[in-house]
Amino acid sequence: MTTAAYVHRVEGFGTVTVRPVEPERDAPLLHGWVNEERAAFWGMVGTTVEQVRDIYAHLDSLTTHHGFLVSLDDEPVALFQTYDPEADRVGECYEALPGDIGVHLLIAPGTAPQPGWTGRLLTALVAFALRDRTRVVVDPDTANEKAIARMVRAGFELGPEVVLPEVDLPEVFIPEKKARLAFLARR
């Protein structure tokens, strides 16, 4: 069992625990999440449990990209990925600064039942991402107005609209995406 990378108590919300994805252990759970149509931009709709395991085993071997399973009061609620923007397609669309960290967040199906739930979770995850970095970069789809509004409420400054190039690797295919960059600097 992997030790938690980060534990953050959010008053009135619960204890958020962030731990590295364990590909063998977590693949069945993540498979269900990334195969939903709402997760299409993760590029894994139609994958098998074994393919999800292999993708996260590959991710685990990288020094630039990291996958984390997020739990709230010991219940898995999200998949959180961090990455070095210069080693990712987003790095082709803006000038990355030293200390930047990119993040992707996938909320588990059936969670976030109360207004403000995702915002409280995001507060803990941003604190985790900014422990040793100075700025978080996100790239939600331009059509995802809900996610963009959530980022603004969380204090992110909107950046330009960009087109992220497609990624076609043996492990995953991610189509070209129109994205709205947003940035949150550590205060």
Where are these regions (language model features)?
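Active-site rim helix/loop that mediates acceptor-substrate recognition in acyltransferases
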Residues: 46-67
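Acetyl-CoA-dependent GNAT
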Residues: 60-102, 106-111
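Conserved acetyl-CoA-binding loop-helix of GNAT-fold acetyltransferases
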Residues: 114-131, 149, 153
